[in-house]
């Protein structure tokens, strides 16, 4: 199953969400994970309430449980910040104490059919997956928000591509790519994006190496970052250094007569975008010949 850069959304298994991590997006993921995956009704304190797709209806106790906070004030501050950022809308009825929130970026294609009262409309914790808009973290970047760990984690996940012909490295396994010319990344680039120092970026990848292994390229080219846990229908082993270097070598060979200005990282990113299609075709031809033999 491909995950092309042009796709507007990516899949995120609820089981993979790093619930221990800090950052505003972990609260968003908690809320999204408990929202209704299809239209229906739900009971709260004897009342039957209509629940729309991507919404949740309940009380403050339930909300605090979802967010895993103890104080009402803390829960409402989180909801206010998420609403200010445009990730949710919510209302709290002062008379009935019923709180309703709706995920603004809900992907309707992932929703099931409407169901009648008595059937389950909410998801089971740690089961299934969320459909996340690929650009969901961009507003944090645009607002100059300093990322938390969960924000950075989701940022990498939502910029995962797989078998995209503009990135030959993604034919080995799901890889992280920011834009057409950003398949090879540097710690400095990510630090600038997340408002982190380089050493903090390095510690992040050391801690989350089970999710996002780094593969350093020679010199000052940068790193290829893979997403080890992204769901595919293929069995993807971790790419070996030999496989990655083979692709890099082919890209450089095909780009040897191509002149472009800029630092090494800028140049290699252009070469990857320009030459990946030819490299992929060559590797597929080699594989076909081996199969015939």
Model-identified regions with their sequence ranges:
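Low-complexity, intrinsically disordered/propeptide-like segments
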Residues: 7, 15, 32-34, 70, ...
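Short recognition helix of helix-turn-helix/winged-helix DNA-binding domains
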Residues: 1-61, 95-181, 185
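Append "and, occasionally, other polyanion-binding protein interfaces
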Residues: 164-165, 176-196, 232, 253-293
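Short flexible/disordered coil segments
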Residues: 94-114, 157-164, 218-239, 284-289
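Winged helix-turn-helix DNA-binding recognition segment
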Residues: 37-101, 164-228
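Charged/polar, solvent-exposed surface patches and flexible loops
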Residues: 33, 65, 77, 138, ...
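Short, amphipathic alpha-helical interaction segments positioned at domain boundaries
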Residues: 105-143, 232-271
């Amino acid at each position: 199953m491909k995950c092309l850069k042009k796709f507007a959304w990516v899949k995120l298994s609820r089981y993979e969400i790093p619930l221990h991590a800090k950052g505003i997006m972990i609260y968003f993921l908690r809320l999204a994970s408990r929202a209704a995956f299809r239209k229906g009704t739900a009971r709260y304190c004897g009342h039957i309430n209509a629940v729309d797709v991507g919404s949740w209806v309940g009380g403050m106790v339930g909300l605090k449980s979802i967010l895993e906070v103890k104080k009402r004030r803390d829960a409402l501050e989180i909801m206010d910040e998420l609403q200010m950022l445009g990730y949710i809308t919510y209302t709290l009825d002062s008379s009935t104490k019923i709180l309703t929130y709706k995920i603004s970026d809900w992907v309707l294609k992932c929703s099931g059919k409407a169901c009648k009262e008595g059937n389950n409309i909410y998801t089971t914790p740690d089961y299934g997956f969320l459909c996340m808009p690929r650009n969901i973290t961009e507003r944090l970047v645009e607002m100059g928000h300093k990322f938390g760990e969960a924000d950075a984690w989701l940022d990498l996940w939502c910029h995962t591509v797989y078998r995209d012909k503009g990135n030959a490295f993604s034919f080995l396994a799901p890889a992280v790519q920011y834009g057409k010319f950003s398949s090879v990344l540097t710690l400095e680039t990510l630090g600038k994006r997340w408002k982190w120092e380089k050493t903090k970026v390095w510690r992040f990848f050391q801690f989350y190496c089970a999710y996002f292994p780094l593969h350093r390229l020679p010199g000052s080219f940068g790193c290829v970052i893979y997403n080890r846990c992204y769901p595919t229908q293929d069995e993807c082993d971790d790419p070996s250094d030999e496989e990655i270097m083979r692709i890099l070598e082919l890209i450089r060979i095909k780009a040897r007569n191509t002149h472009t200005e800029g630092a090494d990282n800028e140049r290699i990113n252009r070469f990857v975008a320009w030459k990946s299609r030819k490299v992929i075709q060559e590797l597929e031809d080699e594989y076909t010949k081996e199969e015939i033999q």
